[in-house]
Amino acid sequence: MAHQCACFHFFLCGFICYLVHSALAANSSSTLCFWFPLAHGNTSFELTINYTICMPCLTSQAARQRLEPGRNMWCRIGHDRCEERDHDELLMSIPSGYDNLKLEGYYAWLAFLSFSYAAQFHPELFGIGNVSRVFVDKRHQFICAEHGGLNSTLSTEHNISALYAVYYHHQIDGGNWFHLEWLRPLFSSWLVLNISWFLRRSPVSPVSRRIYQILRPTRPRLPVSWSFRTSIVPGLTRPQQRKVKFPPESRPNAVKPSVFPNTSR
């Protein structure tokens, strides 16, 4: 009897452990993070974008119909005309997680919005899938995306910019160019922010100081004030005359004016 109870408890504990392990495995997720310096703020909102998913109409019938009310010069691939309902909405939620009321700089906003869009709608760009949420680690200034895959297919041997370029041009050929225009600011703003962060914290070298001194604008010259006494230097306003040497005993005395001319006006 005791042996049966021990076996029952053993199988019961094993079953409970299996359920817990399955639940943890189902909820397990990996995190992909990007470091964006100078990213602070406290806001959460949703961004909705209306965009057409139609290609330009190329047929003569569509060219005539585009002038009619309710028609458009853009039509779906394989169709000869475009209706008013031939559009789509892109709904993107902007995550919260900031403690200030602003993002410091336009590039921080641009990078934040671009990464949020790319992680939610094009996670394959980063070698991930099934992105559950995008959040911010304000302590380390990380913008992260939680995804369901345990391993990322993004090879560490390749540059993310090169992978982006290949993926971008491949998607352009596939007809998704209107989606991926949002991905350009991600890498440009990321580069600008990191370069700015590096330049702010790097010591000033003598070369940079010299360039600054050369390129520093000069002060504008102030108007000359004539309210002080001036003396006329002989020889500046009169033509130069030949010098005559006098003997020491016959040297003429220089006459000094007793009163200087008033030039305060």
From Swiss-Prot:
InterPro entries: Arteri_GP3 (IPR002556). Minor envelope protein. Heterotrimer of GP2a, GP3, and GP4. The GP2a-GP3-GP4 complex associates with the E protein. It is a single-pass type I membrane protein. Keywords: Glycoprotein, Host endoplasmic reticulum, Host Golgi apparatus, Host membrane, Membrane, Secreted, Transmembrane, Transmembrane helix, Viral envelope protein, Virion. It comes from Porcine reproductive and respiratory syndrome virus (isolate Pig/United States/SD 01-08/2001). One of its GO terms (cellular component) is viral envelope. The chain crosses the membrane at residues 6-26. It is found in: Virion membrane; Host endoplasmic reticulum membrane; Host Golgi apparatus membrane; Secreted. It comes from the Viruses. Pfam families: Arteri_env. The gene is GP3. This is Glycoprotein 3. Belongs to the arteriviridae GP3 protein family.
